[in-house]
């Protein structure tokens, strides 16, 4: 098992993550997790042999809200880990520019062959 980089017990997001913008409330990942909450309510009704779509609408709303809330923080954590990874990668690229040299840019005229229409 790989140890964590900065092991801090009971810390979901460090204070450093507060500088990142929050995820949008209409983020497709959040809407997908909310839909999974709705599906969890349907499965719960199916398991307990209740009418699948019509029984316990308050339970459906509870599942949707809970899944959406958890998904929000999971998306926020994912964005933070990607930001840390990007910062480390760009820092490495600044320290080792010889490994990431710029290639000479070619125009499309140099890449493609001459076009001769055939009629």
UniProtKB/Swiss-Prot annotation:
<keyword id="KW-1133">Transmembrane helix</keyword>
<dbReference type="Pfam" id="PF06374">
    <property type="entry name" value="NDUF_C2"/>
</dbReference>
<comment type="similarity">
    <text>Belongs to the complex I NDUFC2 subunit family.</text>
</comment>
<keyword id="KW-0999">Mitochondrion inner membrane</keyword>
<dbReference type="GO" id="GO:0045271">
    <property type="term" value="C:respiratory chain complex I"/>
</dbReference>
<dbReference type="GO" id="GO:0006120">
    <property type="term" value="P:mitochondrial electron transport, NADH to ubiquinone"/>
</dbReference>
<dbReference type="GO" id="GO:0005743">
    <property type="term" value="C:mitochondrial inner membrane"/>
</dbReference>
<keyword id="KW-0813">Transport</keyword>
<comment type="function">
    <text>Accessory subunit of the mitochondrial membrane respiratory chain NADH dehydrogenase (Complex I), that is believed not to be involved in catalysis but required for the complex assembly. Complex I functions in the transfer of electrons from NADH to the respiratory chain. The immediate electron acceptor for the enzyme is believed to be ubiquinone.</text>
</comment>
<feature type="compositionally biased region" description="Basic and acidic residues">
    <location>
        <begin position="1"/>
        <end position="18"/>
    </location>
</feature>
<keyword id="KW-0472">Membrane</keyword>
<feature type="region of interest" description="Disordered">
    <location>
        <begin position="1"/>
        <end position="22"/>
    </location>
</feature>
<comment type="subunit">
    <text>Complex I is composed of 45 different subunits. Interacts with TMEM242.</text>
</comment>
<feature type="transmembrane region" description="Helical">
    <location>
        <begin position="56"/>
        <end position="75"/>
    </location>
</feature>
<dbReference type="InterPro" id="IPR009423">
    <property type="entry name" value="NDUC2"/>
</dbReference>
<keyword id="KW-0812">Transmembrane</keyword>
<keyword id="KW-0496">Mitochondrion</keyword>
<keyword id="KW-0679">Respiratory chain</keyword>
<keyword id="KW-0249">Electron transport</keyword>
<protein>
    <recommendedName>
        <fullName>NADH dehydrogenase [ubiquinone] 1 subunit C2</fullName>
    </recommendedName>
</protein>
């Amino acid at each position: 098992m790989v140890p964590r980089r900065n092991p801090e017990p009971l810390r979901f997001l460090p204070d450093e993550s507060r500088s990142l913008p929050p995820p949008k409330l209409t983020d497709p990942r959040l809407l997908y997790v909310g839909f999974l909450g709705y599906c969890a309510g349907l499965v719960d009704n199916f398991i307990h042999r209740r009418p699948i779509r019509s029984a316990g609408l308050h339970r459906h709303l509870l599942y949707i809200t809970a899944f959406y809330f958890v998904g929000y923080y999971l998306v926020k954590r994912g964005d933070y880990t990607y930001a840390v990874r990007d910062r480390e990668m760009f820092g490495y690229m600044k320290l080792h520019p010889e490994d990431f040299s710029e290639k000479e840019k070619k125009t499309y005229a140099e890449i493609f062959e001459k076009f001769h229409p055939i009629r």
